Amino acid sequence: MESSNGTRITWLGHSTVLIQTAKGTNILIDPFIADNPKFPVGFELPSKLDYVLLTHGHGDHISDVVPVATKHNSTVVAIYELADYVSQQGVKNTIGMNLGGTVQLEEVVATMVDARHSSGAQDKHGTHYVGVAAGYVLTIPGSPTLYHAGDTAVFGDMKLISELYQPEVAMLPIGGHFTMGPKEAAMAARFIGAKTILPLHWGTFPPLKGTPAELATLVDSGVRVVQWVPGDTF
């Protein structure tokens, strides 16, 4: 299930994805590994892992950022307060940014866009303010434009993301309960205008009941919902 343009997107369960470009830049989004019941057994991250992108501060999205970034000497990209928080936890290389901002990650242009979700980081000292939740648009030369929505509800300004960046492949949460479910994700797909949907944040835990099969019955004609399992590469 591999795309033909040279960019590979591997789903590692929940919202964790590995993006590998044709030029060899490797980007991991939302590292949830050790406690992720859907992380593919036996899968090993590439030794060269250039960047780790964080969408927000919840544990099921950042729990492995310190060991992963430390082992691979990765640069962590996150909203400013979250970048500062993981720096205090031991991450050496960070890029703090904010909504609407754009950074260059080798040949990849990464733009931080809005999401509608909470974003407190929890540890033994309590819950910490770490900025707001976000998504990312990734523009890669010779590749379809990618959108990782992070955790989010559907919101009208997804139409602005479509107008500004024209994402062609959208990674959307569909499980419901903590994010939008299939009904809302179908509306999000309509707002965004992407013709390929990669479903995330479903099936990991019992409350996340939405499925790609259900989403496929709700999207507009001509929109492909990829039916994948953790470990698959698109």
Where are these regions (language model features)?
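Pre-active-site segment of Zn-dependent metallo-hydrolases
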Residues: 18-58, 63-70, 118-128, 152-164
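Binuclear metal-ion centers of metallo-dependent hydrolases, dominated by the metallo-beta-lactamase
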Residues: 87-102, 186-234
